[in-house]
């Protein structure tokens, strides 16, 4: 059910960091309520890319995405960038009215840059504001360096979103005092 207070969490895995030369290879979404309770998990989509495109990945991306199995999932996928955008938009429309939720995640500006370049209809669904958990991470590192949130590092989209939500819960409990 749509609610203006629901939050859209998104994570992308890409072939690199430049939206003009790199592409999205995986995306996932989660909807939470304003208290960070998960309401629904959206589709986890490996976006098909050609072998030629995948061969352009740098060493880190080649190793990381190859080791996680993502590169193989991308090769085997039949889902185009446009289809991935449409499936994700169809899911979030069930939960959040247009332009009411900030885009939520870790280092979310990077994801937003890729959405703007490759999935503009989806990017336009979000409010112009960002809810970036990495802002709190940076502030905690400077103002309360004893606070440490332990993260995994699968670099798979759904795992990364779950970690981002857990990390925001951690900062809410230990860093943001009522």
Curated annotation (Swiss-Prot):
Keyword Nuclease: yes
InterPro entries reported in the protein's UniProt record: Exonuclease_RNaseT/DNA_pol3, Oligoribonuclease, RNaseH-like_sf, RNaseH_sf
GO molecular function: 3'-5'-RNA exonuclease activity; nucleic acid binding
E.C. numbers: 3.1.15.-
Residue numbers annotated as active site: 128
Entry's localization field: Cytoplasm
Family annotation (Pfam families): RNase_T
Predominant place of localization: cytoplasm
Domain Exonuclease: 7-168
EC class: hydrolase
Superkingdom of the source species: Bacteria
GO BP, sorted A to Z: DNA metabolic process
Record-linked SUPFAM superfamilies: Ribonuclease H-like
Any GO CC annotation of this UniProt entry: cytoplasm
Keywords: Cytoplasm, Exonuclease, Hydrolase, Nuclease
Cited function: 3'-to-5' exoribonuclease specific for small oligoribonucleotides.
Family stated for the protein in its record: Belongs to the oligoribonuclease family.
Record-linked PANTHER family: OLIGORIBONUCLEASE, MITOCHONDRIAL
Record HAMAP family: Oligoribonuclease
Protein name: Oligoribonuclease
Source organism of the structure: Pseudomonas syringae pv. syringae (strain B728a)
